[in-house]
């Protein structure tokens, strides 16, 4: 982004605080939307010199436009051009018209989570930009501007739909057992239901990718960031490492673990499949005369990109029972399976959450593991509540169900 303040924020604030390149890119895209919706924000210096900040009208326009897809965002002050109706028929189908309007609406607007994140990143940038100006002020002028900036931030916060992160209501769910059976059968290279073309390398590679994600839990970027040197064939252990701004990674969207490193022990079946893939990988690289340190590669010998993982998921969604599958759902499935197995074995909930943090690469302060254990954590409380209800609200004709 060719902008002084955005670049200064990215380099001086985000980069120094440990943000990865992909995270910085995401936040800068949000700032680009801010500039598009409110062109005045691309050069706030004249306004700041007058001691002014964003107005309520401008802020309302920004919040409205953040609901739109990037290409549909309208600059402040521009009139939104009406859509001229086609005059092909005097009589039109009401159902067809409703369908077109619904499609147009869906194509133009983003979901609530996307808007929330956009707003969050823009608030972060505007807060930083205001702070940069505040440090140059003194006395009453400083206090007045700080109050104005705080009011705008509070206004944005009050008018932004919040995402409910309470683990009691948002515990993520993975594939159920029946869906997992369908998935594992479909990715078998010899299965007649295998959705990928009859190429041994592609089928074995895709099977390994899915198995790693659903059986050990790494994110999509974590799998793509694995190097061949991260696997120790003697111990059967695999490292998932975060290599921020890796100079050897030339992919447009850099990969790697989102958080810190984690060490995964693989069982015999996964080790066997991994070694089978390594043999095919070596033959392909020799044939293509290519070299890459990354484990998962394309049929051309290049490091596989995230878009290819998305293609793998799209192929699987064509299979009945797997219509809603996506990369992160496999991580949810792994975590849900891990918790269910540990609870069945009598492992303490606190220990399960600690194990999830270690294996899943979450920080010690992360509450994400509690989203997976919440259903089991509150099960005893729900049981006691039902017992109390039965005691205090007896049935008129109490009968034991057959």
Model-found features: residue ranges?
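Short, charged phosphate-coordinating catalytic segments
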Residues: 131-136, 213-238
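Catalytic-site neighborhood detector that most strongly recognizes the C-terminal catalytic loop/helix
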Residues: 360-390
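Active-site/catalytic core of tyrosine-dependent DNA strand-transfer enzymes
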Residues: 266-323
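Basic, Lys/Arg- and aromatic-enriched nucleic-acid-binding interface segment
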Residues: 185-220
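Short, basic (Lys/Arg/His-rich) helix/loop patches that form interaction surfaces
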Residues: 194-196, 310-358, 362-366
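DNA breakage-rejoining catalytic core of tyrosine-based enzymes
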Residues: 153-188, 249-268, 286-290
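Conserved tyrosine-mediated DNA breakage-rejoining catalytic core shared by Y-recombinases
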Residues: 225-273
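N-terminal core-binding DNA-recognition domain of tyrosine recombinases/integrases
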Residues: 6-25, 31-160, 190-197
